[in-house]
């Protein structure tokens, strides 16, 4: 198993040094300086690795060479240097205080006597602790150049510089050489000093051209970086007229760059656009022969401005994945169904007697189903890479705003609910698959209201006691049923039985002619005005006295579920205990008819005891004038009431009272009592 720490260290080294060839020229310079010092002082310094800096860490060799340069300057009567270096030569350990003192003395001599530029200087720690070997190498090369002017033996790189200088002086067209290179090549030499420039053999030049072609051949691009040979060791690179001088130093191909040297590999890595953009050239590569796409050679990377042949054809043609491959990658695709074919979701409708909690639960069902459908719709629309042969989804139709009057008219209509959730979404089992295929078959529920204000439902086509249950809840649908509750069987809808069902169960609005409807509205207005006048007349004869405060209702009576029951008590139900009215003087009086605010808005029918009250009031005589009447707010007779009003005898009316428009309406459309079986 690979060491993770080593992997991290390797990646860090790659991030710090993006080019492996950037350190090659430092190694080449170290080898050249080691040969130079070994030839001068017979030291035996290794040229590779850390052995070169380790041999110079005591500072003894550096101070010895400084004194040699000073003696050569004195012999030639040169102006500089004038003073040597005093140092400790015996029993000096690397890294000790004396070693640091020797290195510091050499650095001071370079600054003061030779005038080495500060950019080429190094610090004591750079040599003793081997922190910055590049600065040490560059400083030693500059010291070697200054010593070569005084007649001392120079390293091979300095000899190459002197040779290039003579070649440039012999060339008549000096303008072709860059100005920066001219400044570097102009090296002042002391007159009378013999030059020790080694001669390059023809074998070296022949090997140089072969090595250059080999390095250029490592790039596998069709259009390689141009490097044209002008003369022996002189090349023109790129599209410009820039000339570079190339020399061979041991196993390295060196290029004269500005005032220093660089390897040809590193130079091409920085100037060749193909090598700069490709990461494959940043690692050491083996030499490859003829280019063959079948061999395991590095992948050719196209240069900017020179596209690979055939790339136009590949780029102009869009990449299209075959449908068969997509099916294998993405799995089997299920045919999508347009959203218009999905059955509409049922709207939640609040009936009279329903509490707020039941209404919210009724809304949570369809809303949850709608969110599921929207989620599935978004999943259907998410993959944009579907084949065009699939059935496109039709655009969504905007939902029209629904007003309150429309909702009130829809309250009296029979509620239609689609199939259950399992029939809409799941198609795993055969029963659910059959149910989803018959999605258009819709169940009709018949909802009725009992005398105590409770609702019960039965499925259409069921006889007898088919009520699914009663309670203060919303009319149950197959979606709202719990798993434990039995589902009503979806049988064939019998036509005669549906026709024989009383209209009060469906609570459909009465179909009247426009003339009868206007006449009914006119009677209602007249009755309303008459009642208002009677209330004003009764209020004028009210004795001076404050009416007793009503008792504080219990929290169980504050919910909207008891509002309809309270209205039904005020509307007049027979046989219920504690339903006697209360007047200002404590006498019980007949109950006034109350209009239902929720359940009877869309239906012209009255409560169950409406017709009986009309008959009783006509037999008993005219109604007494009511000053202040308030019904008992108690819908639970089994519990002990908090306050029971004192019953008193009714007053005898002074004159007969005529029937109102509501009684006339019952004469037009008599109410049909629901079946006892329901």
UniProtKB/Swiss-Prot annotation:
PTM-bearing positions, type Omega-N-methylarginine: 490, 507, 630
SMART domains: CH, GAS2
Residues carrying N-acetylalanine: 2
Sequence positions bearing Phosphoserine: 306, 316, 352, 355, 394, 436, 438, 482, 489, 493, 654
Purpose: Seems to be involved in the cross-linking of microtubules and microfilaments. Regulates microtubule dynamics and stability by interacting with microtubule plus-end tracking proteins, such as MAPRE1, to regulate microtubule growth along actin stress fibers.
Family statement drawn from the similarity comment of this UniProt entry: Belongs to the GAS2 family.
Protein name in the entry: GAS2-like protein 1
UniProt source species: Mus musculus (Mouse)
Gene name of the record: Gas2l1
């Amino acid at each position: 198993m690979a060491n993770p720490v080593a992997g991290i260290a390797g990646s860090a080294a790659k991030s710090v040094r993006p080019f492996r060839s950037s350190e090659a020229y430092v190694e080449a310079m170290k080898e050249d300086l080691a040969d130079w010092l070994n030839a001068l002082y017979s030291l035996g310094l290794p040229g590779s690795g850390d052995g070169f800096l380790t041999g110079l860490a005591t500072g003894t060799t550096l101070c010895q060479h400084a004194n040699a340069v000073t003696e050569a300057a004195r012999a030639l009567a040169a102006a500089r240097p004038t003073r040597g270096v005093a140092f400790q030569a015996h029993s000096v350990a690397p890294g000790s205080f004396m070693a640091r003192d020797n290195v510091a003395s050499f650095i001071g001599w370079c600054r003061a006597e030779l005038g080495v530029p500060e950019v080429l200087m190094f610090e004591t720690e750079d040599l003793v602790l081997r922190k910055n070997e590049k600065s040490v190498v560059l400083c030693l090369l500059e010291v070697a150049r200054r010593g070569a002017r005084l007649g001392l033996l120079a390293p091979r790189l300095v000899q190459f510089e002197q040779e290039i200088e003579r070649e440039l002086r012999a060339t008549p067209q000096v303008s072709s050489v860059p100005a920066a290179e001219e400044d570097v090549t102009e090296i002042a030499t002391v007159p009378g000093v013999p030059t020790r420039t080694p001669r390059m053999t023809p074998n070296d030049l022949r090997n140089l051209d072969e090595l250059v072609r080999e390095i250029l051949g490592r790039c596998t691009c069709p259009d390689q970086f141009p490097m044209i040979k002008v003369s022996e060791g002189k090349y023109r690179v790129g599209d410009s007229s820039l000339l570079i001088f190339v020399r061979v130093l041991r196993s390295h191909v060196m290029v004269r760059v500005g005032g220093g040297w660089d390897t040809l590999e590193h130079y091409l890595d920085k100037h060749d656009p193909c090598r700069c953009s490709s990461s494959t050239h940043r690692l050491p590569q083996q030499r490859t022969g003829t280019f063959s796409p079948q061999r395991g050679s590095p992948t050719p990377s196209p240069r900017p401005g020179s596209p690979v042949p055939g790339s136009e054809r590949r780029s102009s043609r869009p990449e299209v994945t075959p449908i068969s491959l997509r099916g294998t990658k993405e799995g089997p695709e299920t045919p999508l169904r347009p959203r218009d074919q999905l059955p509409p979701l049922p709207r939640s409708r609040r009936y009279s007697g329903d509490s707020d909690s039941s209404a919210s639960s009724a809304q949570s069902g369809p809303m949850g189903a709608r969110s599921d459908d929207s989620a599935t719709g978004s999943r259907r629309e998410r993959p944009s890479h579907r084949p065009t042969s699939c059935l496109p989804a039709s655009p969504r139709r905007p939902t029209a705003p629904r007003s309150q009057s429309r909702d009130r008219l829809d309250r009296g209509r029979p509620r239609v609910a689609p199939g259950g959730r399992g029939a809409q979404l799941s198609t795993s089992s055969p029963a659910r698959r059959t149910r989803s295929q018959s999605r258009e078959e819709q169940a009709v529920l018949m909802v009725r209201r009992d005398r105590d204000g409770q609702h019960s439902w039965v499925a259409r086509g069921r006889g007898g006691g088919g009520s699914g249950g009663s309670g203060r809840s919303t009319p149950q649908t197959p979606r709202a049923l719990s798993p434990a509750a039995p589902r009503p069987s979806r049988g064939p809808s019998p036509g005669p039985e549906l026709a024989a069902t009383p209209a009060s169960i469906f609570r459909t609005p009465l179909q009247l002619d426009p003339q009868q409807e206007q006449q009914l509205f006119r009677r209602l207005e007249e009755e309303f005005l008459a009642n208002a006048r009677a209330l004003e007349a009764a209020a004028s004869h009210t004795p001076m006295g404050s009416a007793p405060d009503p008792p504080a209702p219990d929290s169980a009576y504050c919910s909207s579920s008891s509002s309809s029951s309270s209205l039904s008590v005020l509307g007049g139900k027979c046989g219920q205990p504690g339903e006697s009215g209360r007047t200002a003087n404590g006498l019980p009086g007949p109950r006034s008819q109350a209009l239902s605010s929720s359940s009877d808005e869309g239906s012209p029918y009255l409560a169950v005891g409406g017709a009986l009250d009309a008959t009783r009031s006509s037999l008993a005589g005219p109604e007494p004038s009511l000053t202040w009447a308030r019904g008992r707010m108690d819908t639970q007779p089994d519990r002990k009431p908090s306050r029971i009003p004192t019953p008193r005898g009714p007053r005898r009316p002074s004159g007969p009272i005529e029937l109102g428009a509501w009684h006339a309406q019952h004469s037009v459309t008599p109410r049909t009592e629901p079946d006892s079986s329901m």
